[in-house]
């Protein structure tokens, strides 16, 4: 059973620095794309159900050009099942991929794991994005983890700005959009990210002029049903850290326990 419904206001992230990927739950492709540090380039679609892509004859794969990005962002990719892509700079580079490299991309989409580090000079890609039921299980390879820190901080503040618990977060009139959580704040959670942590918007607390979002270290999961079950137990314990927003100075800080 997918505990999807009752778990929508949490984000799980586990960073594997050696292999350059992050596994996550609760971050969807549209959030990833709209909160990217640099706008996404063209996407070579490895596994998908998108019906408006252009066809690349050399690889027999479809692709999305950057000026068409809004279409795929609005397409509801979480209903595709598997959604896997790699970004690229120029189609000329895609046409230069050899048989071995095309085979590596197909293998990666199928197994959700690359045979070799999935960064190709021909594509000059920043990411390899592998998801199943997008937002439920996402595994993203980052050439530069700064892209991850920025995206996570921006996604969290945008989620907070749009959260609806029927009456807006905490039943208050909606505040102006929250500023992006700076990467130095996210950096403070380096070690916890490596262990696997949950950022719980559902357990956010409003205190005098502050919003505090608790964080629990929960471990390394591939099975998100299991993660959600374990989270329901761990959220009864004191949090391992907080993301704190000062509504007066409009600034974010990290509190580690």
For each feature predicted by the language model, list its residue ranges:
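Structured alpha/beta or helical-core interaction and ligand-binding surfaces enriched in interleaved
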Residues: 1-210, 216-257
């Amino acid at each position: 059973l997918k505990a999807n419904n009752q778990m929508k206001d949490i984000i799980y992230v586990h960073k594997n620095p050696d292999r350059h990927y992050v596994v996550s739950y609760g971050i969807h492709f549209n959030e990833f794309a709209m909160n990217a540090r640099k706008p996404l380039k063209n996407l070579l679609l490895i596994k998908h159900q998108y019906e408006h892509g252009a066809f690349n004859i050399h690889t027999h794969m479809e692709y999305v050009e950057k000026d068409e990005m809004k279409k795929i962002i609005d397409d509801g990719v979480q209903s595709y099942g598997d959604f896997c892509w790699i970004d690229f700079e120029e189609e000329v580079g895609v046409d230069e991929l050899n048989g071995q490299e095309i085979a590596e991309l197909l293998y990666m989409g199928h197994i959700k794991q690359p045979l070799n580090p999935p960064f190709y000079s021909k594509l000059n890609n920043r990411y390899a994005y592998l998801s199943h039921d997008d937002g439920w299980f996402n595994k993203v390879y980052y050439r530069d983890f700064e892209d991850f820190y920025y995206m996570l901080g921006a996604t969290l503040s945008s989620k907070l700005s749009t959260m609806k618990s029927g009456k807006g977060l905490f039943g208050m009139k909606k505040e102006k959009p929250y500023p992006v959580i700076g990467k130095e704040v996210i950096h403070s959670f380096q070690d916890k990210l490596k262990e696997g942590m949950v950022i719980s918007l559902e357990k956010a607390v409003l205190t005098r002029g502050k919003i505090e979002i608790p964080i629990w270290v929960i471990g390394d999961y591939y099975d998100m049903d299991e993660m959600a079950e374990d989270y329901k137990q761990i959220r009864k314990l004191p949090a391992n850290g907080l993301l704190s927003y000062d509504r007066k100075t409009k600034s974010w800080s990290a509190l580690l326990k």
